[in-house]
From Swiss-Prot:
GO CC terms, sorted: endoplasmic reticulum membrane; membrane
Topology, Cytoplasmic side: 2-39, 110-123, 173-197, 253-259, 331-387, 448-453
One Pfam match: Serinc
Gene encoding the protein: SERINC1
Membrane topology summary: Multi-pass membrane protein
Name of this protein: Serine incorporator 1
Organism of origin: Bos taurus
Covalently lipidated residues, kind N-myristoyl glycine: G2
Length: 453
């Protein structure tokens, strides 16, 4: 009897696996908009992939992966498999994830509303989609080595570069939303308290940036041969200073009332992080001491028979993972009305979460119904671009691949280490990021015939 009841209970989940409403998550969470719940499920699936990739770097997993026929062929005697297997496994796992999201991105081009038949694939059929993703990942492990790793390294680097820029756009959006929220509360009442909070947050960001610059000059510019680091630190410091001054100019304030030092302080902190991340990827080890070595601890490395040391877990990599998680989940629940950012991310100006309280009662939720459901709030039009969202997750998969492997590239010269290419990718992304932020400030002054409200 118990078995029959158990089967009936399991059968009740079948509509969730195949239907259009992502009720797998809704059963655990309050009722919400379909547009938000769907994005959260895709983000959670990517998070599971990240966790599996991290497990694949654990030494205990390497022996199991080594049992795959031909997985380490032609590498014997050049780079030990106990180093290379984890590296290749992460590449193949992220390749599968990236292809899954890229296929969905192509499939969802120009979906305008949930009435489009393709929207049902986006918002439902979870079992079949995830089964397909797992099949793609498994198939990726049987791709012949050849030039796959080298080619995918450069593809991953380009994708990670684009995702860093998306991170910056979302960071600008977050800073604007943060500033607007606190300014509104300051105007509503208790202005001194909220003004102090706003000032404290801004001062803290600039203080962290100043401390970072000092530490960079102390630990990353010696010996004298580390001239590139001196240039990177100095240039980015001056660029951040210029952007901060520009954000409070009278003309900028007149055309962009939302601009201020809080946003520029957030951008400054992120730019300092990118500068640090770039310097830790320099091939010359004397110019890029790890954070743990700086504070007096030894980092864990994998040492090959040739005495080569490959350190898989860097502090900047861990911070990169944290930023990645915050970025992906923020993009899944963001409610910004910033029109400039919404145009860049192809998102509707309408809020996707605030509508929960005022969602139309069209039968999706019945009075007295205790079942948690997702309300279809996209019948008249989608609140975000399905295609762009999946493309962002495609880029996120590449960013994770590069972060987990510390931007290492396998070299036939029996070495696995970072390249100057990785350094310039990160530094150039920091420069482009500052240019993008400055453009959000000056665009209303340059393009006077356009509405930037």
């Amino acid at each position: 009897m118990g078995s029959v009841l158990g089967l009936c209970s399991m059968a009740s989940w079948i509509p969730c696996l195949c239907g259009s409403a992502p009720c797998l998550l809704c059963r655990c969470c309050p009722s919400g908009n379909n547009s938000t719940v769907t994005r959260l499920i895709y983000a959670l699936f990517l998070l599971v992939g990240v966790c599996v990739a991290c497990v694949m770097l654990i030494p205990g997993m390497e022996e199991q992966l080594n049992k795959i026929p031909g997985f380490c062929e032609n590498e014997k005697g050049m780079v030990p498999c106990n180093i290379l297997v984890g590296y290749k496994a992460v590449y193949r796992l992220c390749f599968g994830l990236a292809m899954f999201y890229l296929l969905l991105s192509l499939l969802m081009i120009k979906v305008k509303s949930s009435s489009d038949p393709r929207a049902a694939i986006h918002n439902g059929f979870w079992f079949f989609k995830f089964a397909a993703a797992i099949a793609i990942i498994i198939g990726a492990f049987f791709i012949p080595e050849g030039t796959f790793t080298t080619v995918w390294f450069y593809v991953g680097m380009a994708g990670a570069f684009c995702f860093i820029l998306i991170q910056l756009v979302l960071l600008i959006d977050f800073a604007h939303s943060w500033n607007e929220s606190w300014v509104e509360k300051m105007e509503e009442g208790n202005s001194r308290c909220w003004y102090a909070a706003l000032l404290s947050a801004t001062a803290l960001n600039y203080l962290l940036s100043l401390v970072a610059v000092v530490l960079f000059f102390v630990y990353y510019t010696h010996p004298a041969s580390c001239a590139e680091n001196k240039a990177f630190i100095s240039v980015n410091m001056l660029l951040c200073l210029g952007a901060s001054i520009m954000s409070i100019l009278p003309k900028i304030q007149e055309s962009q009332p939302r601009s201020g030092l809080l946003q520029s302080s957030v951008i400054t902190v992120y730019t300092m992080y990118l500068t640090w991340s770039a310097m830790t990827n320099e091939p010359e080890t004397e110019c890029n001491p790890s954070l743990l070595n700086i504070i007096g601890y030894n980092t864990t490395s994998t040492v090959s028979k040739e005495g080569q040391s490959v350190q898989w877990w860097h502090t900047q990599g861990i911070i990169g993972l944290i930023l990645f998680l915050l970025c992906v989940f923020y993009s899944s629940i963001r409610t910004s009305n910033n029109s400039q950012v919404n145009k860049l991310t192809l998102t509707s100006d309408e809020s996707t979460l605030i509508e929960d309280g005022g969602a139309r009662n069209d039968g999706s939720l019945e009075d007295g119904d205790d079942v948690h459901r997702a309300v279809d709030n996209e019948r008249d039009g989608v609140t975000y671009s399905y295609s762009f969202f999946h493309f962002m997750l495609f880029l996120a998969s590449l960013y994770i691949m590069m972060t987990l492997t510390n931007w290492y590239r396998y070299e036939p010269s029996r070495e696995m280490k970072s390249q100057w290419t990785a350094v310039w990718v990160k530094i150039s992304s920091s420069w482009i990021g500052i240019v993008l932020y400055v453009w959000t400030l000056v665009a209303p002054l340059v393009l006077t015939n356009r509405d930037f409200d």
